[in-house]
Amino acid sequence: RRNKRGPVSLSDVQANAVSRYDLHDPELNRVLGGGLVPGSLILLGGEPGIGKSTLLLQTLLRLTDRKVLYISGEESEQQIKLRADRLAPSASGNNCLLLCETNLERIFEQLRDVSPDLLIIDSIQTMATETIDSAPGSLSQIRTCAAEFLKYAKSSATPVLLVGHITKDGA
């Protein structure tokens, strides 16, 4: 939602106290300023293999009070389940829904049906929309898909966590 009135003084803005999502991890909550803000989009970036997916899976297994949709464009349901069992053998995972999909339009069909409390996209480089004629991972695909996830986060007040891979040259 854009302000159609023009610029306003920061001191005139009324800020309501926002209830953040407690991630049940003191350090992660601290890094995020006290937890996840509803409607926010967080990019978790780093080189491939450093543990971004593992960190997010470990986090969502702690969130027994939230419905989490974990969308993977890189791993199968079985691979994710094996890693989850290794990380938290006693966790039920009942709050976690898995979707192995890379097509943006099909993902949004599922989002309308599921309405998660938290959305995890692993990774943004694997996502693609049919509206752009380029390969997944191209700059135009990444920008467009990330913009659509941001719109979803803002319109639904759902926090979205995006995994992004950074190559050795920083791309």
What are these regions (language model features)?
Residues 1-2, 161:
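Non-catalytic accessory segments flanking P-loop/AAA+ NTPase cores
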Residues 2-90, 108, 112:
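The Walker A/P-loop phosphate-binding site
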Residues 17-20, 45, 92-101, 128-143:
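Flexible beta-alpha connector loops of hexameric P-loop NTPases
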Residues 28-31, 44, 80, 122, ...:
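Conserved RecA-like P-loop NTPase ATPase core
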Residues 48-50, 74-78, 86, 102-106, ...:
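Conserved nucleotide-binding/hydrolysis micro-motifs of P-loop NTPases
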Residues 67, 94-95, 115-118, 155-162:
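Loop/turn-to-beta-strand initiation segments
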Residues 109-121:
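Proline-aspartate-enriched helix->loop->beta-strand connector
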Residues 140-165:
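Substrate-engagement module of ASCE P-loop NTPases
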